[in-house]
Swiss-Prot record:
Description of post-translational modifications: C-terminal thiocarboxylation occurs in 2 steps, it is first acyl-adenylated (-COAMP) via the hesA/moeB/thiF part of UBA4, then thiocarboxylated (-COSH) via the rhodanese domain of UBA4.
Protein name per Swiss-Prot or TrEMBL: Ubiquitin-related modifier 1
Organism: Botryotinia fuckeliana (strain B05.10) (Noble rot fungus)
Gene3D superfamilies cross-referenced by the UniProt entry: 3.10.20.30
Pathway annotation from the record: tRNA modification; 5-methoxycarbonylmethyl-2-thiouridine-tRNA biosynthesis
Superkingdom of origin: Eukaryota
One protein family per Pfam: Urm1
Annotated Gene Ontology cellular component terms: cytosol
Annotated compartments: Cytoplasm
Chain residue numbers at which the record places covalent cross-link Glycyl lysine isopeptide (Gly-Lys) (interchain with K-? in acceptor proteins): 106
Alphabetical list of InterPro entries matching this protein: Beta-grasp_dom_sf, Mopterin_synth/thiamin_S_b, Urm1
Transmembrane feature ranges: none
1-thioglycine: modified positions: 106
């Protein structure tokens, strides 16, 4: 029987975990398709994380103009998301998406 959801793992490091209730790893079950019936993408996931998972009000520390903020490295299954199509990458079951802040205050 086919399922209508994907099981993925989303991780945050470099201080980003503080925006997500200090939880570094999140095992999520997300729909296979968005509200328009298109396959869900990393871009969709970023919005989902902001709307459904992030409890912190400082969303601007994660996104800027509806895009992942500059200075945040995104890895899809240990590969730079630039090699995978960035926000247009279509999520697959068992994907591991890692967000790493490369900016640190001092």
């Amino acid at each position: 029987m086919a399922t209508d959801t994907l099981s993925i793992v989303v991780e945050f490091t470099g201080g980003l975990e503080m925006l997500f209730s200090d939880q570094r790893s999140h095992k999520l079950s997300v729909p296979k398709t968005d509200s328009k019936g298109a396959p869900v993408t990393v871009g969709w996931l970023v919005n989902y994380l902001c709307d459904e998972i992030m409890q912190d009000s400082r969303k601007d520390m994660f996104v800027l103009d509806d895009h992942v903020r500059p200075g945040i490295l995104v890895l899809i299954n240990d590969a730079d998301w630039e090699l995978e199509g960035e926000a247009s990458y279509e999520l697959q079951s068992n994907d591991n998406i890692l967000f790493v802040s490369t900016l640190h205050g001092g």
